[in-house]
Regions:
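Sec-dependent N-terminal signal peptides
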Residues: 4-13
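Flexible, low-complexity junctional segments that flank or bridge functional domains
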Residues: 17-224
Length: 224
């Protein structure tokens, strides 16, 4: 029994260290040399493993995009800064099931337990995307100031149109079919925002409803 308890304690300590090391990597810039090697690695793996890589993009065009990306890498980048540069190339392959994910922060067991007892922040709502605009589609919990039809103008003092322009290159679809993209964006932008800014307990919102503009905060709430 003592050995089992000792094993459990060592496992917990090891898990905490692993989470810590993983999250520390998010803030460590990767050298230019290694970034360029990673670009070549991604390119080679796509050519080797993707059976229909050139259905919607020519080999010459894809090669050019990877080569062009390498010329823009002139300083070390953090993992998710690099993700923002590489992901658009993956999107340009125009294969709906092919996606590059951000390097997410890992949570400790304590953080996971804490979040399990709370409702979400942005994912409590469904949204509609109309060009560079976001509207609230539903508000099941009837959160004040987030009525159905409310237009979100800014989040965390960042204009919605700027956020969506930044996130558009990360949303892929099959071929030239762009119809699906607005629905995918409506589902995914809260997750992309969270990957970029972290798991927040509250966030500042500027919104417009019935021609009235308000600034307020939405908060996580305990599950009751």
């Amino acid at each position: 029994m003592k050995k089992f308890i000792l094993f459990c304690l060592l496992f917990i300590i090891s898990s905490c260290v692993s989470v810590k090391k993983h999250n520390e990597k998010l803030e460590i810039p990767i050298s230019v040399e290694h970034l360029k090697k990673d670009i070549d690695f991604a390119h080679q793996k796509l050519e080797k493993l993707h059976p229909k890589l050139y259905w919607y993009i020519s080999k010459e065009d894809l090669n050019h995009q990877f080569d062009s990306l390498k010329t823009t890498i002139n300083k070390p980048l953090k993992p998710n800064e690099f993700y923002q540069k590489l992901a658009p190339i993956i999107t340009n392959i125009k294969e709906g099931h092919l996606r590059l994910n951000a390097y997410d922060k890992r949570l400790t067991k304590k953080e996971i337990k804490h979040l399990k007892n709370q409702k979400g922040l942005l994912n409590r709502y469904n949204f509609v995307i109309d060009n560079d605009r976001i509207f609230v589609k539903d508000n099941v919990d009837k959160i004040p100031n987030m009525n159905v039809g409310t237009e979100i103008l800014a989040i965390k003092d960042i204009l919605v149109k700027d956020l969506l322009q930044k996130y558009k290159p990360l949303i892929n679809s099959d071929g030239e079919n762009t119809t699906f993209q607005k629905y995918s964006m409506a589902r995914r932008w809260p997750s992309i925002f969270t990957a970029e800014y972290g798991i927040l307990d509250s966030v500042k919102i500027e919104a417009k409803y019935q021609n009235e503009i308000k600034t307020f905060y939405i908060h996580r709430e305990k599950i009751t």
